[in-house]
Amino acid sequence: MPKREDIKRILVIGSGPITIGQAAEFDYSGTQALKALKSAGYEVIIVNSNSATIMTDPEFSDAVYIEPLTVEFLEKIIEKERPDALLPTLGGQTALNLAVELAERGILDKYGVQLIGAKLESIKKAEDRELFKETMEKAGLEVLRSRLVNNLADALETAREFGYPVIIRPSFTLGGTGGGIAFNEEELRDIVTKGLIESPVHTVLIEESVLGWKEYELEVVRDGAGNFIVVCSIENLDPMGIHTGDSITVAPAQTLTDVEYQRMRDAAYKVIDAIGIETGGSNIQFALDPETGRMVVIEMNPRVSRSSALASKATGYPIAKVAALLAVGFTLDEIPNYITGKTMAAFEPSIDYVVVKIPRFQLEKFPGADPRLNTQMKSVGEVMAIGRTFKEALGKALRSLELDAAPKLDLEHIREHLANPTPERISYVFAAFRNGMDVEEVHELTKIDRWFLREMKACIELEEELKLKKFDVEILKKAKQWGYSDREIAEIWGVSEKEIRKMREDNRIFPVYKMVDTCAAEFEAQTPYYYSTYNGVENEAVPSDREKIMILGSGPNRIGQGIEFDYTNVHGVWSFQEEGYETIMVNSNPETVSTDYDTSDRLYFEPLTVEDVLEIVRNEKPKGVVVAFGGQTPLKIAKYLVEEKVNIIGTSFESIEIAEDREKFAKLLKQIGLKCPPFGTASSVEEALRVAENLGYPVLVRPSYVLGGRAMAIVDTPQELEMYVKEAAVVSPGYPVLIDKFLEDAIELDVDVVSDGKYVWIAGLMEQIEEAGVHSGDSACVLPPVSLSEKLVEEIEETVYKLVKALKIVGVANIQLAVKDEEIYIIEANPRASRTVPFVSKAIGIPVARIAAKIMVGRNLPELLSEYFPYPTRPGVKVDKLDESEILPTPWPKMFSVKEVVIPFHKFPGTDVLLGPEMRSTGEVMGIGEDFAEAFAKAQIAAGNPLPTTGAILATVADKDKREAVPLLAHLADMGFEIYATRGTAKALQSHGVEVKVVPKVGEGRPDVIDLLEQGKISLVVITQSSDEPALVAVSHGKEPFKVEGRRTVGYMIRTTALKRKIPYLTTVESLRAAVAAIRKMKKGSIVKVRRLTDTWKM
């Protein structure tokens, strides 16, 4: 069937901020789909609240809206743009939920918008647990016994009837949010209560447990003519009971018999037929009882998903692109296979290799959270590796995670960790075999299939053989074929990694590169997409004779290093291509645009380790390697690449080293007459206490060479310092701990700057909204700044110019400054792209990373900027010619942009929500407005924390904050809010003439502050941290992964209750001040104003 001619304009809803369960895979899917729809001749409108996405770049659509993803904002966009159709299957759960709401409220009918890609009825059948169960039973498919309940009493009765354990699944939530496994009544009460709050429709499904069964997924595609293909089968190494996003998964499935696979395939067709999926991709999950062979359907997603991104990368079959074309009427036999260029999309992919995905966790960022894995997803990212065998792929995937070795435990602890899965589970399986446990015993505790366990046990037996045959060439070859890295072999043999590399080179033991081609080499692939293997002879990655640049990606998403760096990488690739270079991308993350088959000229899906990168360099011989775009991961290996004579493009390694080494950096600042906060370094607890005593408390403690403020803290007492130093020493062994004097009440600024060696251009000058001391990645920020004088801005420009010239920056860098008493202090300089580059690019309308990349290959900065000149500058600054001075004019947009963060606290009940110098956010949103108040209010809505305009406020403010907080609370009272406060805060408010109701703290009488929150009487909580209230910290003592120190105070109880009840909360005076301005703006009139992104640049 040809494409539909009755629709011309299509609205696509993005997935919003990166959260656990909904990450970069939707930017990858969305970008792919937008390209496909545009190439088919449609006009496309995209709306997303996340600026750090390629899909919101103007070149991919006809109109881009960076606006909150709510029905109110979407209706305004529909009214303005008048699309003919809405495609909701590319933006994850967020887009599906919004499509349902727009349809049910009659908005789609009102403006004549059709749903394409999935019918409303189909979405409901797939998403509504009860309807899904009924539909499956009608189709003759077995599902688990289950019952939908909307109250605790029914849940308890159902669980008694089914027998414990039971699984609780809240309706319409993402990544299993609010769900879990209850082994007894007490756990059931807790999970159901939370689940009913988390579910937007306040229902949960109570389901019989199939803990320990095997879990499989099929990625399927169907077209309007009824053609149906299975793109990929995926097997979860972890059994049922662990969310598939937290499971290690393997493709294709390894332990299914052909008969079982055919049964599953037939069932998958019946599922999508019964649900009514006429076009597009779906993911269907099955559970299989290994003892009886009983197979049940667990669930299906009628959209592209995390698994479909994985299946696309694993097979080379672009599911999102195909799904988008099917949605507009094409059939599978009309869509080419883009990898081979010869076959059609109706051919099922076949693969002659094994793919392993492993999730990346960061539970140490959330002290107090339960580390056990269950049906609620907790991982923040994932890696994928490809090998000719399961062993090889597993070895490569494990080293892609960039994790340290697991703590050594005794057998008792190992058994406990096997029975109660935690993120380190795979390490404990290996540890069990090292300690002499057999396959049967490990299987009983973990329910991992015996085939996988035998493979893993064989690896441990190989380690024993390696110990016995030191420097044996044949055993070295075998270890490489089984996925062992040079570093692992070096550790077993007690030598350096370099020595193993030399031994390999002397004996000509090198990997070959094979192609991912969707057809097991039956047809020649047109798109060079490679993986390495030691199990092969022919090298398929034959290098061209073009001049090449190799870009190192950022590896798995994690806190502090997310999608923002992938955005920069992709822009870098495009720039180098425009300058005539062949681009080589190296990355291990299946969720990203950078690992799409058609982003770079050549893609290597490989771990980002020294060994793997050097092997690609040996094969490709690039002109140079770019380490400045992938966050900290490439920077960590830059030193070793330079030692091997690899050319680093852009800022030199010497400059990188100066910026990363505090002593060298402080010396440089002194030479050029710039200030930094007084500091010292310490290699022991005694030394640290001495340094802090000299500086005076409070001090900021941090390890060297980390990203995202790992193990960073503000410390007020010697006791706290001792505790933190022990933690920091674990994080960065061999590197001293850095201790800075903490600048209280300073304004923090973030500067993204570009230089070609001569000219210096501040692309973005951002003011942090949170107080100094909150990690810049966790603070909201505003561009342009709102509280800097003209004189101060000029001084900042001079300061940045001096520093950039001294560091010899070529390309992009990020500098953090603090301003206290009109003095400028340099906090740190990062000689690489920062996480704010996409935000700045969207705020000013100039692609910062593209310009930086071109500079790295010799282009001139004023010449590159002239394309965008004249751009708005500060009021009163008139610029006729760009290169009048070596300091190029700083952009000063007329519209205000606020970047707000999203932190997954609700996934980790028990964690304190206080912000500090350790970063914990997973994603971000952007709010754009005519003034700061409008931009801030929109950013709060986009982040899922809309500020109230009426109701009651609970205030409990620390003594140190009362002077500034009381007038702000008085403003809220004047606006009609009812104020409740604890005794001390109430007294301060009453002395300012504010009417207030006093509420007892916990233990001072009932109803107390917690009762008030639980009763739903409060619409906003204002609570700042008192200095005698220590934060909970994760401390690693080497024995256990981590434990929590600190005490759970009343403040902690209030904050966690507000989080649980979904009541907006403010924990600093700065955020209160911004909120007061935003609420005042909202009271004056609607802020539901929508503007095309490109229009905001012209104002």
Curated annotation (Swiss-Prot):
Annotated residues for binding of Mg(2+) 1: 285, 299
State any GO CC term: cytoplasm
Family matches, as SUPFAM superfamilies: Carbamoyl phosphate synthetase, large subunit connection domain, Glutathione synthetase ATP-binding domain-like, Methylglyoxal synthase-like, PreATP-grasp domain
Is Nucleotide-binding set as a keyword in this record?
yes
- Listed binding positions for Mn(2+) 1 are 285, 299
Positions contributing to Mg(2+) 3 binding: 816, 828
Q: Where is this region: Oligomerization domain?
A: 403-541
MGS-like domain sequence ranges: 945-1099
Name the positions where Mn(2+) 3 binds.
816, 828
Enumerate the GO terms in the molecular function aspect: ATP binding; carbamoyl-phosphate synthase (ammonia) activity; carbamoyl-phosphate synthase (glutamine-hydrolyzing) activity; metal ion binding
Which pathway does this polypeptide act in? Amino-acid biosynthesis; L-arginine biosynthesis; carbamoyl phosphate from bicarbonate: step 1/1; Pyrimidine metabolism; UMP biosynthesis via de novo pathway; (S)-dihydroorotate from bicarbonate: step 1/3
**GO annotation terms (biological process):** 'de novo' UMP biosynthetic process; glutamine metabolic process; L-arginine biosynthetic process
Start and end residues of each ATP-grasp domain: 133-328, 666-857
The alphabetical list of record keywords is: Amino-acid biosynthesis, Arginine biosynthesis, ATP-binding, Ligase, Magnesium, Manganese, Metal-binding, Nucleotide-binding, Pyrimidine biosynthesis, Repeat
PROSITE patterns in alphabetical order: ATP_GRASP, CPSASE_1, CPSASE_2, MGS
Stretches the record annotates as Carboxyphosphate synthetic domain: 1-402
Q: Which NCBIfam families match?
A: CPSaseII_lrg, PRK05294.1, PRK12815.1
Subunit comment: Composed of two chains; the small (or glutamine) chain promotes the hydrolysis of glutamine to ammonia, which is used by the large (or ammonia) chain to synthesize carbamoyl phosphate. Tetramer of heterodimers (alpha,beta)4.
Extract the PANTHER family matched here: CARBAMOYL-PHOSPHATE SYNTHASE [AMMONIA], MITOCHONDRIAL, CARBAMOYLTRANSFERASE FAMILY MEMBER
Similarity comment: Belongs to the CarB family.
Q: What does this protein do?
A: Large subunit of the glutamine-dependent carbamoyl phosphate synthetase (CPSase). CPSase catalyzes the formation of carbamoyl phosphate from the ammonia moiety of glutamine, carbonate, and phosphate donated by ATP, constituting the first step of 2 biosynthetic pathways, one leading to arginine and/or urea and the other to pyrimidine nucleotides.
- Recorded protein name is Carbamoyl phosphate synthase large chain
Q: Which organism is it from?
A: Thermotoga petrophila (strain ATCC BAA-488 / DSM 13995 / JCM 10881 / RKU-1)
